[in-house]
């Protein structure tokens, strides 16, 4: 059975990926690691094996990997897009310094390394519709710059040293468990909370601004799927486009109204996040992921909306 380490385990994806990996591989085969003290974390992370570690501390991370004979690492440490614009130097240090440390350790210890890229790796010159797997990127955010550099680093370490690097380009991720963490696509999570609590939402992204989105169950499916895939089928290896649904604010509002008929929405545009959103594609072409490792999402906008409202209503309203 695989021994798996998840670094950045307390983030939006990690906090849900860890329980899912433990369900699949067994609680004792999945180690969660994060900078935070265990007392700050959800029981789902610390009930199993947990190690406190800074990804920039190479010796500490290497010690953990050796201690548990780790076969696969999911690297989920990152400062997200809007936070990265406020702290660009820190974004570079964490996003790329942490990745470089893991790549160097992987070169020595020979484990699989999953590092996600993002829709944020694209820029204004990128084709907006059905964005190809291989195309011009040229992002305009520091987050995007670190993601493109990360894609290239992972390719380099595979070609130069044979490190088994794998990854996908995630769209905006929508979760019913974890709160948003400073991303441009966070409106598509916030809107459900406000719809349930206030039946109204003030949106910071303009009407008509399309972005690729994905429900968390499909996000986990993509991460685990590419790590379990037969790499002999790969033409690409890192940064596979994975898509699920593309919508703009009016469409998500309409989907919510099907469940909460008196829901209303107005706008107060955030120029920083709007500018980032406009630089990204409307929809990615994920045909390479479908062909090379059988990627297929399970949720569309309506089925996700029904599930989000059902789950969040129980939690927020005790229904």
Predicted segment positions?
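N-terminal Rossmann NAD(P)H-binding glycine-rich loop of SDR-like oxidoreductase domains
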Residues: 4-24
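SDR active-site strand-loop-helix element
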Residues: 7, 33, 73-79, 113-119, ...
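Rossmann-fold cofactor-recognition segment
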Residues: 45-56
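NAD(P)H-binding glycine-rich loop region in Rossmannoid oxidoreductase-like domains
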Residues: 55-94
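Conserved Rossmann-fold NAD(P)-dependent oxidoreductase catalytic core, especially the SDR/UDP-sugar
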Residues: 75, 100-142
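Active-site helix of classical SDR
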Residues: 146
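NAD(P)-dependent short-chain dehydrogenase/reductase
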Residues: 155-210, 216-221
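C-terminal substrate-binding subdomain of Rossmann-fold SDR/epimerase-dehydratase oxidoreductases
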Residues: 204-206, 211-319
């Amino acid at each position: 059975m695989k021994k798996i380490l998840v670094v950045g385990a307390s983030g939006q994806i990690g906090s849900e990926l860890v329980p899912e990996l433990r369900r699949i591989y067994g609680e004792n085969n999945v180690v969660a690691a994060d900078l935070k003290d265990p007392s700050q974390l959800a029981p789902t992370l610390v009930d199993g094996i947990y190690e406190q570690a800074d990804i920039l501390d190479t010796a500490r991370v290497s010690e953990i990997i050796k201690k548990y004979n780790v076969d696969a690492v999911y690297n989920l440490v990152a400062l997200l897009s809007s936070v990265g614009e406020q702290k660009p130097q820190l974004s570079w240090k964490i996003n790329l310094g942490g990745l470089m440390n893991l790549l160097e350790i992987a070169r020595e210890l020979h484990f699989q390394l999953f590092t996600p890229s993002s829709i944020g790796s694209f820029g204004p010159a990128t084709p907006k519709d059905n964005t190809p797997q291989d195309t011009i990127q040229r992002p305009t955010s520091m987050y995007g710059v670190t993601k493109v550099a990360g894609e290239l680093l992972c390719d380099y370490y595979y070609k130069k040293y044979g490190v088994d690097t794998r990854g996908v380009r995630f769209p905006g991720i929508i979760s019913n468990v974890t709160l948003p963490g400073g991303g441009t696509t966070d409106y598509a999570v916030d809107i459900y909370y406000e719809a349930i609590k206030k039946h109204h939402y003030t949106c910071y992204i303009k009407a008509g601004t399309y972005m690729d989105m994905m429900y968390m169950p499909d996000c986990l499916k993509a991460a685990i799927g590419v790590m379990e895939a037969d790499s002999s089928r790969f033409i690409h290896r890192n940064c596979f486009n994975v898509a699920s649904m593309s919508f703009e604010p009016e469409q998500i509002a309409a989907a919510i109204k099907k469940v909460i008929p008196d829901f209303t929405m107005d706008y107060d545009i955030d120029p920083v996040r709007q500018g980032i959103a406009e630089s990204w594609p409307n929809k990615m072409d994920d045909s390479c992921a479908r062909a090379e490792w059988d990627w297929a999402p399970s949720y569309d906008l309506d089925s996700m909306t029904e599930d989000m409202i059902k789950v969040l209503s129980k939690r927020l309203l005790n229904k």
